[in-house]
Amino acid sequence: MRTHYCGDVRSHDVGTTVTLFGWVDRRRDHGGVIFLDLRDRSGVVQIVSDPERTPNSYAKAEQLRNEYVVKVTGRVSARPEESLNPRLPTGEVEIYADQIELLNAVRKQLPFQVSTTESESVREDLRLKYRYLDLRRETMAANLQLRHQVVKAMRRYLEDEQNFVEIETPVLTRSTPEGARDYLVPSRVNPGEWFALPQSPQLFKQLLMVAGYDRYYQIARCFRDEDLRADRQPEFTQLDMEMSFMSQEEILELNEALVCHIFKQVKGIELPRPFPRLTYAEAMDRYGSDKPDTRFGLELVNVSDLMKDSGFKVFSGAVASGGLVKVLPIPNGNDLISNVRIKPGGDLFKEATDAGAKGLAYIRVREGGEIDTIGAIKDNLTEAQKAELLQRTGAKPGHLLLFGAGTAAIVNKTLDRLRQVLGRELNLIDPAKINLLWIVEFPMFEWNADEKRLEALHHPFTAPYPEDVQDLKTAQAQAYDLVYNGFEVGGGSLRIYQTELQKQVFETIGLSPEEAQNKFGFLLEAFEYGTPPHGGIAYGLDRLVMLLAGEESIRDVIAFPKTQQARCLLTSAPAEVDLRQLKELHVASTSQPKVNG
């Protein structure tokens, strides 16, 4: 029977006999004495097999190789002074093995080295194909342990400190496509009808408020069929919360306390409160993003009013058509950024055009306040405009000014992208710094140019401010996002809880009364039976753990993630299914079957 995990043996165990189970991380033979590093999910401890002191185990120790599974029973001893290993929590002790039992061997060559001492870089596709081996590695074990600690801290705080109740909501529900595409599941017993996997528990948690469960939470699995990137997965996990009879201020205060509790429990960090707040308008104006990384400066400057009368048609034309002209000022940019990078073919020019810009205009500030740029800008700014530009941007000799001109969406996306790239490149970001802030006062709606209609910026169940109800199209939402070092880790709002207002919002986003009734009739009816005022929030657990772990991809904090092509390399999912299964589901495929060979 196991007495300890490998990583838990300490100096206070010296003199005791312990039984451990684990994998051979490394085997070394020093002058006839065999040293084994034994590993389990808790860490590594050193095992010693000496032919004189532990003859019963020595023959077995000679047979062992990396990743063999063994049981070890032995006596804990203090390491000699010269053998202490301060890098390991178990580095003050070693275990003299009285018995070693081989439980299983490795019968194939390992696709990569698992040992904690190996520093080789392993291709991600190989790691994902052999994920069960990758999860044995020290970094991945630490990440999953961190994830567990985060969830544990969430549960303990919400249940023990705030009287929340954990309630599960359905995974098979109906499709209500308003955002990303749904994953659909055919119903065998109801031919021609389909379930959808939930993109969030949004409607069910609101119904729980109607039912009187005024403080609900759930560690919820969610599904979205969308294009992937480093911090997205087709299936992901949320901490989902909903509360009745609470104001926005009370919800924000409770959630700040929750986040501070998580940081204290899992990282030992005391976060200052209250968290800073920016309105959506302020964030977009200063940073070009509603999830700004505020660990560094490089704030944007709006010069639209200054450029509307300039002779440079790109700038004046952008303003005349309702767009913006903004500047990203870069101190010492003249020395740090060459012309090659900001002209066509350069990497920064490409960043701008990839964001939708038609080009990248710039000004270099020289000694004496002289400006150096392409002739079209220089020749079409008056001396007064030049002076005002330098004054507003705080530009000094050596500054590089990068311009964005066009629609607000393109200008903000372009300069936000450049700001992030240059912030990292110029080492302006302290990786140890933690900046958390709330973004508040979002617009209720944004214009969808492709579909030529308004759509909800968050979702159509978000409540407007009461004073904005008379003109919903320009209303601000009682919504809030939590931003952590440039990543949105949580988002929520107060909800609509009156039937008529909910119908008006559906109408504003282009849903006819018939469509609204067909998709959301059950919710509208529920609102007729005494619905309390309520609001909530959801945290992206994967993204939060990624940031706490210092990783760059959420795939490194998920046990069995999908690739950016939404595939599981371990199981080869998704895969074709047997024709008989499709017939049972009354489903026919429009894709041509794959031809083997």
Curated annotation (Swiss-Prot):
GO MF annotation list: aspartate-tRNA ligase activity; aspartate-tRNA(Asn) ligase activity; ATP binding; nucleic acid binding
GO cellular component, one term: cytoplasm
Binding-site list for ATP: 224-226, 233, 488, 540-543
Superkingdom, taxonomy of origin: Bacteria
UniProt cross-references to InterPro entries, sorted A to Z: Aa-tRNA-synt_II (IPR004364), aa-tRNA-synth_II (IPR006195), aa-tRNA-synth_II/BPL/LPL (IPR045864), Asp-tRNA-ligase_1 (IPR004524), Asp-tRNA-ligase_1_N (IPR047089), Asp/Asn-tRNA-synth_IIb (IPR002312), AspRS_core (IPR047090), GAD-like_sf (IPR004115)
Reaction catalysis annotation: tRNA(Asx) + L-aspartate + ATP = L-aspartyl-tRNA(Asx) + AMP + diphosphate
Entry keyword set: Aminoacyl-tRNA synthetase, ATP-binding, Cytoplasm, Ligase, Nucleotide-binding, Protein biosynthesis
Site (Important for tRNA non-discrimination): 30
Subunit structure: Homodimer.
Name under which the protein is recorded: Aspartate--tRNA(Asp/Asn) ligase
UniProt source species: Cyanothece sp. (strain PCC 7425 / ATCC 29141)
Underlying gene: aspS
